[in-house]
A protein has these predicted regions:
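An acidic, glycine-/histidine-flanked metal-binding catalytic module
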Residues: 2-42, 46-55, 166-223
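Generic alpha-helical secondary structure
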Residues: 34, 38, 42, 75, ...
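Solvent-exposed loop and beta-edge segments used for protein-protein assembly and interaction
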Residues: 41, 98-100, 143
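Generic solvent-exposed, charged/amphipathic alpha-helical segments
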Residues: 42, 46, 50, 79, ...
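Generic short alpha-helical segment signal, independent of protein family or function
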Residues: 50, 83-87, 122, 126
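A glycine-rich, hydrophobic loop/mini-helix early in the fold
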Residues: 55, 60-101
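Long beta-strand-rich cores associated with HINT superfamily self-processing modules
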Residues: 95, 108-215
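Terminal, regulation- and interaction-focused segments at domain boundaries
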Residues: 102-107
């Protein structure tokens, strides 16, 4: 193990030596200034989502958002991703090419809430949509279902306005339950996944989609 200037350990097997780590994080203040932009972008986005949630609750007597969780990529994750893509380890390159440094996962009550929130965000005039990947209408082969948006939104500081990219994942409670446990089974145990387990995981994903459909149907009956 090696340690960079910020006391963060970077595994040697990830291909980063001390020099490479410190080229990106050579100055603590510069790093903090850059990451402040991403932290503030998360706050700005969460505020917009909370406003939409409260407005919807007032109009429909329920909340479309069950929970939100935000995160910033760790320095080692950022550097490893840049190295895998053959990018120079500097801040301008990082900011221009790594679009998922800041991320928000939004867990919604129903599938229709996912698309409602996505539309509301896309309709906001100062938000730029960088990418949109609809894995709900077109699930991944393993059954994964979620709507991914990469957006760029303005963050207003005392003397400047900066447009910062944020990755948003919107999914239902049922999908989040499946995705969390699937990730644990597939990656945390560090064991090979055979065809039988793959099939069962896919069946569980299909079941979670069936639950979503049934619960949404019941919602419409009751409303």
């Amino acid at each position: 193990m090696s340690e960079n200037l910020f006391g963060l350990t970077v595994a040697a097997d990830k291909g980063l030596d001390d020099l490479q780590c410190q080229r990106l994080l050579s100055e603590n203040r510069r790093y903090q200034e850059v990451m402040l932009q991403y932290r503030c972008a998360l706050k700005a986005l969460e505020s917009r989502l909370e406003i939409l949630n409260e407005e919807f609750s007032l109009q429909h007597d329920r909340n479309p958002i069950e929970s939100m969780k935000s995160r910033l990529k760790s320095p080692s994750s950022i550097m490893n991703k840049m190295q895998k893509r053959g990018l120079p380890l500097d801040f301008p390159t990082m900011q221009a090419n790594i679009m998922d440094i800041a991320g928000v996962r939004v867990i919604c009550s129903f599938e229709e809430d996912v698309f409602f929130l996505a539309k509301c965000l896309k309709d906001q005039s100062d938000i730029e949509i960088i990418t949109e990947k609809d894995y709900i209408s077109h699930p991944k082969p393993n059954g994964y279902r979620s709507l991914h948006l990469t957006i760029r939104l303005p963050v207003f500081f005392a003397e400047k306005e900066i447009h910062v990219p944020v990755e948003i994942q919107l999914r239902t409670i049922a999908t989040d339950f499946w995705a969390s446990l699937e990730h644990t089974i597939r990656y945390k145990k560090n064991l090979p996944i055979n065809a039988e387990i793959e099939t069962e995981l896919k069946e569980c994903a299909d079941s979670s989609r069936e639950w979503d459909g049934k619960m949404e149907h019941l919602l419409h009956i009751l409303t």
